[in-house]
Amino acid sequence: MSTVPAKGPLTPQQLSLINRYWRAANYLSVGQIYLMKNPLLREPLQPEHIKPRLLGHWGTTPGLNFIYAHLNRIIQQRNANVIYICGPGHGGPGMVANTYLEGTYSEIYPAISEDEAGMERLFRQFSFPGGIPSHAAPETPGSIHEGGELGYALVHAYGAAFDNPDLVVACVVGDGEAETGALATSWHSNKFLNPARDGAVLPILHLNGYKIANPTVLARLSDDDLDNLFRGYGYEPFFVEGSEPADMHQKMAATLDTIFQRIQDIKKNADVHSPERPRWPMIILRSPKGWTGPKTVDGLVVENYWRAHQVPVANCRENDAHRKILEDWMKSYDPSDLFDEKGALKPELRALAPKGEARIGANPHANGGLLRKELHMPDFRQYAVNVTEPGAIEAQSTKILGDFLRDVMKLNETEKNFRIFGPDETASNRLGSVLEATNRVWMAETLDMDDHLAADGRVMEVLSEHLCQGWLEGYLLSGRHGFFSCYEAFIHIIDSMFNQHAKWLQVARELEWRKPISSLNYLLTSHVWRQDHNGFSHQDPGFVDLVANKSADIARVYFPPDANTLLWVGDHCLKTWNRVNVIVAGKQPEPQWLTMAEAEKHCEAGLGIWEWAGTEDGLEPDIVMACAGDVPTMETLAAVDLLRQSLPHLRIRVVNVVDLMVLQSPHQHPHGISDEEFDRMFTTNRPVIFAYHGYPYLIHRLVYKRTNHSNFHVRGFIEQGTTTTPFDMTVLNELDRFHLAMEAVERLPLGESVAKPLIDNFTEKLALHKDYIRQHGEDMPEIRDWKWTWPR
């Protein structure tokens, strides 16, 4: 167990100054939670000085302020490059207070000036209508992590540290957050951090003992158990424990001196080509919850107990005794010793804060758009599949994309600003070509038989979707680019992380000072229609439904039907910013439909009429066969083949959709097509049989305001699955060619004499299919060997 000597490095004057600075941050934090007037307590507190609704979290805040003050000291002392990730983001008052003290806040928000009037506005705006949120939200300078939903602080910290060799990411992990699954696995991120090319992450485990109303698990472990636990993870824990401020300041200062020297030594001694995994230092900080706040309220323990978690003194407007407790509490910080007559922080305290971009709140790594550089991109057309006739050849679309991504990796090797992420699926998802340009990063033990593992790899693989998502978010938020491929069904593991990132982007877009960051790009493959071998557990296309719920300024969903369209979409997504792009594409051999020139035109429009597949010949169609997704596209064309053979005079229009959001009105989504264009594509009164990759209701939801919505008949995944054959997956969900053809026949005014024999024939085919697969274990030859044979 590592501790520092009892005698600390601070002189009496330094100790007094840093304690006063901490008191100032605590004072401002309490003021934000409680006050809307009288910010410097120049008169006795009155009910009208108190906010009518008291919102915020005090318990974690003094510890966060303590850490911030000491990071300021080490930044000044060592000219260190530090950002601060606040895992307990509900301690937002502290993060706002500290950026105000250092001057960053007033530079960004001039109305919150460094005087009494500005302080009043600072207090009033917190958790107040028209003001700012209660957490370390995008509005907070220096934050890349809101910390509302807990679990992602440490993984964001590592993401920010990758490829930032001069950066130290101080990451506070609350002991409540430490109980989450995502955080628990994040400790293993040190096996992927290369000291020769990456920055350092300094985890600070803040053990204040309690969550909202319960003790925390780690806080009830002995120091020996904690030391053994984190040494097992590969860290060297340093303990800073106590409640007496002077003693704690000395301990923290000495500990940070030791740790930053340790980090410097680790990086100095790291071998660029084959660095060994070091034992990175971390801090375990034991301090009271609600430190320096009221010890009791109404005879009940508050400080160092869960009652300090949110608002320790709850009824300050109506209850005179409570208001007196608050006033005494705030006066205990002695504001006249901290702020001058105008309400500005006294100069000797302001001198403790770093200057310029060295300030935590002004560090450009926490406003990654300032550092973002465009990727050097190959010409995606060079990877085109040579399509002479629609459906004449097959290819693995994601394998073609892998070749493209390999060269994106090569072209950006010098910049070192592009990584690929995946939960042990890069090769499985047919992106293995990228390993021709780089390796999988790996700092743990390696064996002679290991393949493509290296300390300097740029493919991040670990069997945790949480880590892949979190690393990528941290990497993007600090100004870089990335690409995340995942099995479609298991991307649901990070549904909530996606939610939080999308919310962050939505707010950040409205802040002029936050510059755009690279988009979060997903490739969802090994998808529902080709998970016949793994079964029902692997069959779920619902992630896109979640994405479609998000702001239209953020969400994009693409269903490229073949390799050439996938190349266009992949290239496009890597060039965008402030978006979440979801690409759904299969990895198995599939028919290739469009030439590259056709693919470009099709993708730029987002959807299009495939005239070569239809029979309308410039006339109004009798029926529209629409599709979105590679397998639905193939089944739609196979259904069209059946209809063309059975009903040669039928006028069929085939519409393929790549960009799902074009289906919405332009009033709902910026990619939406006009009502006039929609009606031109889908008609105003003809039946539309829409074969969709996912759950059918999403298409109905997107088009419900369109003229012809009542004639849309959508087929997709209806939660029927098992281990079976590929074609049987479509049959189980009635998305196959026979069901699509029957739906078309039933919707057309053909008369029973024409319709019934066709339906009987298609029904018989389905019965034959069922018998055949149960006897032979594979699809019928006419299904396996089907090809589109109609000439252009």
From Swiss-Prot:
One example of a Gene Ontology biological process annotation: carbohydrate metabolic process
UniProt EC number: 4.1.2.-
GO MF annotation: an example: aldehyde-lyase activity
CDD domains: TPP_PK (cd02011)
Keywords per UniProt: Lyase, Thiamine pyrophosphate
Cofactor(s) the protein needs: thiamine diphosphate
HAMAP family reported for this sequence: Phosphoketolase
UniProt xrefs under NCBIfam families: PRK05261.1-1, PRK05261.1-2, PRK05261.1-4, PRK05261.1-6
Family: Belongs to the XFP family.
Name the UniProt record assigns to this protein: Probable phosphoketolase
Organism encoding this protein: Brucella melitensis biotype 1 (strain ATCC 23456 / CCUG 17765 / NCTC 10094 / 16M)
